Structures are given as structure tokens and as C-alpha cells.
Swiss-Prot record:
The gene is mepS. Its EC number is 3.4.-.-, 3.4.17.13. This is Murein DD-endopeptidase MepS/Murein LD-carboxypeptidase. It is a lipid-anchor. Residues 1-26 form the signal peptide. The lineage of its organism: Bacteria, Pseudomonadati, Pseudomonadota, Gammaproteobacteria, Enterobacterales. It is found in: Cell outer membrane. A lipid is attached at residue 27 (S-diacylglycerol cysteine).
Length: 188
């Protein structure tokens, strides 16, 4: 019996391999139209829904990439104080932060002023906001404020009181002053 143990081990090791081979060969059996289940459809007939799923997946990946880039910029600038007209780490204003973010993270040149930035891209309703959209607010009778939407009703911006921060658009101050959103990043 001692001499037969190595042979028995080889046989026992081979049984799972044989079982897997048999199961896998069943997967490669010919599937003709007559032996398909009624609820099974050919892939070609679902091209449009598959394309829609692929488009949704690609949009999700792009949104994750856009948010990641914006958050990288935020991490680099978090807490930098506000300075009207500023565009450096010694102090930056809202439009300067937006301009630098889009230049450094997306290679996109936006104008320097909030007034000019609000004319860029296309108008987007609040219910259709996407990560990377510009969100614009009224501040006083002629003042304007701009930030970058990052999802979940949040935006990153250079605030006059706290410097570069993330704020909620649902905070009473911002909710009351929300004006519009602009889409400047293409998703193609």
C-alpha cells in the first residue's frame, strides 16, 4: 500500500482537472437558434442597448477622471487664502483658481474674470450638473462668484472667508445666491 500512495495522489489530483475539462467543454457546445432559450437573444439584436451601456460606462470613467483631477488640484491648493486678483499660492481669487485648475488639469484656457468665464461653454440646468461644470453665484448687486462642481451638490472654490475650500450648494448662503452653471468640458 505504501508504494501505491504516490499513484493514488496523482489520480486524486487529476480528478478535479478532468471535472473542470468536462464542465468547460459543455460551455463550448454549439448554440444554434433552435436550441436557444426563448429569452436568449443574439448580441447583434441588442447593439443599441449595449452601446448605451458602453456610453454610460465611458461617461462614468470620464467623470471619475475629471473629479480626480479637480481633487488633485484642490489638495494642492486647499487652504490657500483668498486675494482679489490673486493667482498664486500667496493668495488667489475664485476666477483665478478656476482658470488655473482648467489650465493645469485639462489644458483648457479659460478667461481670467468671472464675468468672462460665465460666457464660456453652454448653459446647464442645475438638475443636469456634471463634475467639472462651472457653478456661478450672485454676490451683491454686481458681484459674481465661480466654483467648480464636483458632484453631490458640492463645489470647490476660493472663498473670501476661508480660501480654497469645498462647499455645499445646499448651504443657505449658496443656495440663495446660485445663478447658473456652464459646461466647458466636452465629454466626447
Amino acid at each position: 500500500m505504501v508504494k501505491s500512495q504516490p499513484i493514488l495522489r496523482y489520480i486524486l489530483r487529476g480528478i478535479p482537472a478532468i471535472a473542470v475539462a468536462v464542465l468547460l467543454s459543455a460551455c463550448s457546445a454549439n448554440n444554434t437558434a433552435k436550441n436557444m432559450h426563448p429569452e436568449t437573444r443574439a448580441v447583434g439584436s441588442e447593439t443599441s442597448s449595449l452601446q448605451a451601456s458602453q456610453d454610460e460606462f465611458e461617461n462614468l470613467v470620464r467623470n471619475v477622471d475629471v473629479k480626480s483631477r479637480i481633487m488633485d488640484q484642490y489638495a494642492d491648493w486647499k487652504g490657500v487664502r483668498y486675494r482679489l486678483g490673486g493667482s498664486t499660492k500667496k493668495g488667489i481669487d475664485c476666477s483665478g483658481f478656476v482658470q488655473r485648475t482648467f489650465r493645469e488639469q485639462f489644458g483648457l484656457e479659460l478667461p481670467r474674470s468671472t464675468y468672462e468665464q460665465q460666457e464660456m461653454g453652454k448653459s446647464v440646468s442645475r438638475s443636469n450638473l456634471r463634475t467639472g461644470d462651472l457653478v456661478l453665484f450672485r454676490a451683491g448687486s454686481t458681484g459674481r462668484h465661480v466654483g467648480i462642481y464636483i458632484g453631490n451638490n458640492q463645489f470647490v472654490h476660493a472663498s473670501t472667508s476661508s480660501g480654497v475650500i469645498i462647499s455645499s450648494m445646499n448651504e443657505p448662503y449658496w443656495k440663495k445666491r446660485y445663478n447658473e452653471a456652464r459646461r466647458v468640458l466636452s465629454r466626447s
